[in-house]
Amino acid sequence: MSTTTGAFIAGGVAACGAVTVTHSFETVKIRLQLQGELQAKQDAAKKYRGVLHGVKVILQNEGPRGLFRGIGSAYIYQVLLNGCRLGFYEPLRQGLATTIYQDAQVQSLGINVLAGAASGIIGAAAGSPFFLVKTRLQSFSPFLPVGTQHNYKNSFDGLRKIHTSEGVSGLYRGVGAAMVRTGFGSSVQLPTYFFAKRRLMKHLGMEDGPGLHLASSTASGFVVCCVMHPPDTIMSRMYNQTGNLYKGVFDCLFKTIKTEGVLAIYKGYFAHLARILPHTILTLSLAEQTNKIMRRLEDRFLSDSLKENL
């Protein structure tokens, strides 16, 4: 394992590579989640009828630019989120294992889940303003609008306008939902990945390499999507509003279910799956490679004493 700083950089680089491929599905997912917001099912117009239809109508009306709205914010967010999630996971896991078992190498499902959740929550809090702007940019459409519309020129224009109109607290609107959502996802992403990796090596005799990384990250992606989607829907709605629709996470959850039915929290699930599977596969597979590169660079340029402090 590279140093904490090295793992942070490796995780951020890997996530940026992944988000380049999967960002368009994230745009469709957000619009599906906001479609028919707080409207009875029979009254809600279906402007986007699924993943492929969503991609099609956005391309027809807005071009490729429409699918990649908010990509700048997405890069910054991914560096902060996955840098923290992948960079802090192992130090937190080892610290907890040392505290409880007096052995940093002990593998415990409970400790792994807790370390994953904690590292994800740290990343979600750090990157929340950029995810807020990203969500608002992606939901905006001059042709087929859904939810509250925010016409920002770019990510930094969005940050400036939010700060001017809503203050610092506005930049952190929905951060509670983001921490719950990412805590759920992170609590299972890395533990599932490493669990699948160990089992595949032990029972199927797979060797450490791209094939093992692909299989392990696929299993992790499925589990992450199932656990994370309901809080993800709530987070999208909390981020996109300006404080006029929901008082908090539970208010948003109850209003959504009461007005649209319980299945409303699974709106955009298949778009999320289309996004999270390749994103998880690419992030974790690329992270294996970027970590190896960081380790080689650290071994070449850093002394042992300096590595212990990073």
Curated annotation (Swiss-Prot):
Disruption phenotype: Leads to fluffy and albino colonies, and reduced conidia formation, when all 6 genes ctpA to ctpF are deleted. It comes from the Eukaryota. Solcar repeats lie at residues 2-95, 107-199, 208-293. Keywords: Membrane, Mitochondrion, Mitochondrion inner membrane, Repeat, Translocase, Transmembrane, Transmembrane helix, Transport. PROSITE patterns: SOLCAR. It is found in: Mitochondrion inner membrane. It is an enzyme of class 7 (translocase). InterPro entries: Mito_Carrier_Antiporter (IPR051508), Mitochondrial_sb/sol_carrier (IPR018108), Mt_carrier_dom_sf (IPR023395). GO terms for cellular component: mitochondrial inner membrane. Disulfide bonds: none annotated. The chain crosses the membrane at residues 8-28, 72-92, 114-133, 178-198, 211-228, 265-286. It is a multi-pass membrane protein. Its EC number is 7.-.-.-. Belongs to the mitochondrial carrier (TC 2.A.29) family. PANTHER family: RE38146P. Mitochondrial transporter that does not mediate citrate export from mitochondria to cytoplasm. Its exact function has still to be determined. This is Mitochondrial citrate transporter E. It comes from Aspergillus niger (strain ATCC 1015 / CBS 113.46 / FGSC A1144 / LSHB Ac4 / NCTC 3858a / NRRL 328 / USDA 3528.7).
